From Swiss-Prot:
The gene is ycgL. PANTHER family: PROTEIN YCGL. Disulfide bonds: none annotated. The lineage of its organism: Bacteria, Pseudomonadati, Pseudomonadota, Gammaproteobacteria, Enterobacterales. Gene3D superfamilies: YcgL domain (3.10.510.20). This is Protein YcgL. It holds the Pfam family YcgL. Residues 12-96 form the YcgL domain. Signal peptide: none annotated.
Amino acid sequence: MPKPGILKSKSMFCVIYRSSKRDQTYLYVEKKDDFSRVPEELMKGFGQPQLAMILPLDGRKKLVNADIEKVKQALTEQGYYLQLPPPPEDLLKQHLSVMGQKTHDTNK
Protein backbone atom coordinates (compact mmCIF):
# COMPACT_ATOMS: atom_id res chain seq x y z
CA MET A 1 0.00 0.00 0.00
CA PRO A 2 1.43 3.43 -0.89
CA LYS A 3 2.48 5.74 1.91
CA PRO A 4 0.10 8.62 2.69
CA GLY A 5 0.71 11.58 0.42
CA ILE A 6 2.37 9.48 -2.28
CA LEU A 7 0.26 8.86 -5.35
CA LYS A 8 0.87 5.68 -7.24
CA SER A 9 1.28 6.62 -10.89
CA LYS A 10 -0.97 4.91 -13.40
CA SER A 11 1.00 2.50 -15.57
CA MET A 12 0.67 2.97 -19.30
CA PHE A 13 -0.28 -0.11 -21.27
CA CYS A 14 -1.29 -0.60 -24.85
CA VAL A 15 -3.21 -3.40 -26.46
CA ILE A 16 -2.01 -4.31 -29.94
CA TYR A 17 -4.29 -5.81 -32.58
CA ARG A 18 -3.32 -7.29 -35.94
CA SER A 19 -5.44 -6.37 -38.97
CA SER A 20 -7.45 -9.15 -40.60
CA LYS A 21 -7.43 -7.27 -43.92
CA ARG A 22 -3.96 -5.75 -44.19
CA ASP A 23 -0.71 -7.64 -43.69
CA GLN A 24 1.76 -6.16 -41.18
CA THR A 25 -0.76 -3.53 -40.04
CA TYR A 26 -1.35 -3.10 -36.31
CA LEU A 27 -3.68 -0.97 -34.20
CA TYR A 28 -2.62 0.09 -30.70
CA VAL A 29 -5.36 1.10 -28.23
CA GLU A 30 -5.39 1.92 -24.52
CA LYS A 31 -7.85 -0.75 -23.34
CA LYS A 32 -8.67 -4.25 -24.51
CA ASP A 33 -11.59 -4.33 -26.95
CA ASP A 34 -12.17 -0.56 -26.63
CA PHE A 35 -12.23 0.94 -30.12
CA SER A 36 -14.51 3.85 -29.17
CA ARG A 37 -11.89 6.49 -30.08
CA VAL A 38 -10.89 4.84 -33.38
CA PRO A 39 -12.59 6.38 -36.45
CA GLU A 40 -15.26 4.16 -38.01
CA GLU A 41 -13.68 4.37 -41.49
CA LEU A 42 -10.33 3.21 -40.12
CA MET A 43 -12.02 0.23 -38.44
CA LYS A 44 -13.76 -0.71 -41.71
CA GLY A 45 -10.43 -0.73 -43.56
CA PHE A 46 -8.67 -2.51 -40.70
CA GLY A 47 -11.13 -5.39 -40.57
CA GLN A 48 -11.77 -7.64 -37.57
CA PRO A 49 -9.06 -6.84 -34.99
CA GLN A 50 -7.06 -9.89 -33.88
CA LEU A 51 -5.42 -9.56 -30.46
CA ALA A 52 -1.63 -9.72 -30.85
CA MET A 53 -0.40 -8.68 -27.37
CA ILE A 54 -0.81 -6.47 -24.34
CA LEU A 55 2.31 -4.43 -23.71
CA PRO A 56 3.39 -2.21 -20.80
CA LEU A 57 4.93 1.02 -22.13
CA ASP A 58 6.35 2.31 -18.84
CA GLY A 59 10.10 1.83 -18.60
CA ARG A 60 10.29 0.61 -22.20
CA LYS A 61 12.74 2.54 -24.34
CA LYS A 62 11.73 1.32 -27.80
CA LEU A 63 9.38 -0.83 -29.84
CA VAL A 64 10.34 -3.03 -32.78
CA ASN A 65 8.65 -1.16 -35.65
CA ALA A 66 7.27 2.00 -34.04
CA ASP A 67 8.60 5.08 -32.28
CA ILE A 68 7.54 4.61 -28.64
CA GLU A 69 7.18 8.36 -28.03
CA LYS A 70 4.86 8.71 -31.04
CA VAL A 71 2.84 5.72 -29.81
CA LYS A 72 2.46 7.20 -26.32
CA GLN A 73 1.53 10.61 -27.70
CA ALA A 74 -1.03 9.16 -30.13
CA LEU A 75 -2.61 7.00 -27.41
CA THR A 76 -2.91 10.00 -25.10
CA GLU A 77 -4.16 12.49 -27.70
CA GLN A 78 -6.33 10.41 -30.02
CA GLY A 79 -6.76 7.09 -28.22
CA TYR A 80 -5.10 4.90 -30.85
CA TYR A 81 -1.96 4.46 -32.95
CA LEU A 82 -1.93 2.82 -36.37
CA GLN A 83 1.27 1.00 -37.37
CA LEU A 84 1.54 0.54 -41.12
CA PRO A 85 3.85 -1.96 -42.83
CA PRO A 86 7.37 -0.80 -43.64
CA PRO A 87 7.87 0.31 -47.24
CA PRO A 88 8.87 -2.55 -49.55
CA GLU A 89 12.59 -2.88 -50.12
CA ASP A 90 13.72 -1.92 -53.58
CA LEU A 91 15.99 -4.92 -54.10
CA LEU A 92 16.73 -4.04 -57.73
CA LYS A 93 17.90 -0.56 -56.76
CA GLN A 94 20.07 -2.01 -53.98
CA HIS A 95 21.56 -4.59 -56.35
CA LEU A 96 22.31 -2.02 -59.05
CA SER A 97 23.87 0.28 -56.45
CA VAL A 98 26.16 -2.51 -55.21
CA MET A 99 27.01 -3.57 -58.78
CA GLY A 100 27.80 0.04 -59.70
CA GLN A 101 30.17 0.31 -56.76
CA LYS A 102 31.90 -2.97 -57.68
CA THR A 103 32.28 -1.87 -61.30
CA HIS A 104 33.65 1.49 -60.16
CA ASP A 105 36.08 -0.23 -57.76
CA THR A 106 37.43 -2.61 -60.44
CA ASN A 107 38.10 0.27 -62.87
CA LYS A 108 40.76 1.75 -60.57
